[in-house]
From Swiss-Prot:
GO terms for biological process: protoporphyrinogen IX biosynthetic process from glutamate. Belongs to the glutamyl-tRNA reductase family. Substrate binds at T48, C49, N50, R51, S99, E104, D105, Q106, Q110. Possesses an unusual extended V-shaped dimeric structure with each monomer consisting of three distinct domains arranged along a curved 'spinal' alpha-helix. The N-terminal catalytic domain specifically recognizes the glutamate moiety of the substrate. The second domain is the NADPH-binding domain, and the third C-terminal domain is responsible for dimerization. It catalyses: (S)-4-amino-5-oxopentanoate + tRNA(Glu) + NADP(+) = L-glutamyl-tRNA(Glu) + NADPH + H(+). It comes from Methanosarcina barkeri (strain Fusaro / DSM 804). The active site is at C49. NADP(+) binds at G179, A180, G181, E182, I183, G184. This is Glutamyl-tRNA reductase. Catalyzes the NADPH-dependent reduction of glutamyl-tRNA(Glu) to glutamate 1-semialdehyde (GSA). Homodimer. Its EC number is 1.2.1.70. The record marks H89 as: Important for activity.
Amino acid sequence: MTEISSMVISHKKAKIEEMESAWHGDLDGLLHNLYNHEYIHECVVLKTCNRVEIYVVSPSSSILFSFAKEMGASTHIIDFYGHDESLEHLLRLAGGLESMIVGEDQILGQIKELYAYSKKAGTTGKILDTAFDKAIQVGKRIRNETRINKGSVSIGSAAVDLAEEILDGLAGKSVLVIGAGEIGVLVAKALAAKDIEAIYIANRTFKKAEELAYELGGYAVKLNDVQTQLKNADVVISGTGAPHYILTREIVEKAIEERDKTRKLLLIDIANPRDIEESVAELDNVKLCNIDNLRVISEKTLKMRKEEAKKAEAIIQEEIKLLNLQYKRQRADKIISDLYKQIYDVRIREREKAVNRLCAYHTIGKIETDVLDDLTHSIANKILAEPTKVLRQAAELGNDEFLDVAARIFCLEKDKVKAEKIKSDCGIKVEKMKPDCESATDRVSEKGN
């Protein structure tokens, strides 16, 4: 049976450098590499600063092991999930329960965006569409019905909380935010609520920096002028999507030389890949923090939200049951649809044969052909009515064996053959072979001639 499987690399097992080294490629390349695989029917890739997750639909549940090897990721930082585990994880993820900052809103937006990206690329289908539509719906419901997203609930706001904790408050401090994308906006808005002296926004696209700075009463800075701004900043929080360092050791070192020697500089890097070169931490009067340092803030937030998390868990378990029922109905609907198509193909062929035989004796008009059409249509529907009812009941009861047998009897599903081929390719003994269904209906109709 074709089902969802997934592989997850996240902050729970991997450090920031391990997540960076797990995947260096672009999203398009990975999506198409997955989708072009013979045994993968659908795929979605989620890549954020805290995780790399791959969801595929395949008759082989072990298909992602080979991709993990290709990525060069160490297996000790990867979780591999089967169908049921993948669904539960995805709903938990959308609900904010898998985030470093439990209940954060940002992850739901990222899921929407990355799912839409895969959908536009043409790599999704009915199975993943159903899962991701449900996940997005559940994420919204959890935030509407619980208080899990109240307070400091994003990487951006957690970075600001970390700066406050390290500096014993931000009052009178000058803060430079590098990046005016989603993370940068979250950081800047969290800072705007603090009693800081000034906020500076630097971005590759200067217009975006100007717009955000204007909204928050700050100052826009061109990315090329960041080194100059470092001379005056107390805190720098960087969260761009750049594939290279924004602040190299050389840039920071030059800025430090022009600063008051007793003045310390706090750098917080919340980008993945990282924006700030690691060796910057070796410089005098510089403290460098990254995503791993946010775990302390995350743990404090988690304690405050345990009760809300319990409510979210209850919603997820309720929605998982509904999602599984939806999949069961879809399985029956697919078999029923294929069965109707098969019977209707026979109906059309036999109707044409009947018309041709009648035409051999005398001319027939539209009335006669309409009667034949109605007759064969009615017979087909009456024959299929009871099987349709029974198949839907079996699906709702979770009787997969019954559905499998029905599909085999009528030669409807090809995934079983494909799964057996995969096992055969892997050297696994295949004891059961699918009967030859080629032109089975033709043989039935030929026998009736």
